[in-house]
């Protein structure tokens, strides 16, 4: 329901003429020496991804409503997974985005490993190891973007406005982040 409300609020802001890059923006400094901030906001793509994720979470909730063993624990991990996904889509800061990506990793392992079927332990371990390996590529890519841009912040909007990452470095950092997310 909140995602539908957010979508209508976003569309209302855009139709009212608000042309800001990101709407409903909030910034709080987490770690001042590296200028890492909790920066969140939405644009058209993130609103669409939030709405799709909300539909999937809503469907997943009702599909598992009558789950018997460890129901409370299941919904705790499912909520934490949802938080990681939603947080990832609203993140503007590279570090915050990476943290939300990692937050979703442990709940996926437990949801598959405990409540899955078939070779659930094998599947959960294989997925977790692959995602952790991808996280290493992603972290290297994020750090490369940060240091390669010469930015004083990990804010994606500010890094994008600098336009100073050389093409040769872009050819290195993009595949690493792509592999990390893939």
Q: Which residues make up each language-model segment?
A:
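Transmembrane helix-loop-helix hairpins at membrane boundaries of multipass inner-membrane proteins
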Residues: 1-62, 66-76, 150-166
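Hydrophobic alpha-helical transmembrane segments of multipass integral membrane proteins
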Residues: 1-7, 48-61, 79-86, 103-106, ...
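Alpha-helical multi-pass transmembrane bundles of energy-transducing inner-membrane proteins
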Residues: 10-14, 73-80, 84-172
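Short, solvent-exposed coil/turn segments
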Residues: 35, 44, 123, 172-174
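Short conserved micro-motifs on helix faces and helix-strand junctions that flank
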Residues: 40-41, 54, 90, 99, ...
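C-terminal ends of transmembrane helices
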Residues: 57-68, 110-119, 181
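Function-critical hydrophobic alpha-helical transmembrane segments in multi-pass membrane proteins
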Residues: 168-182
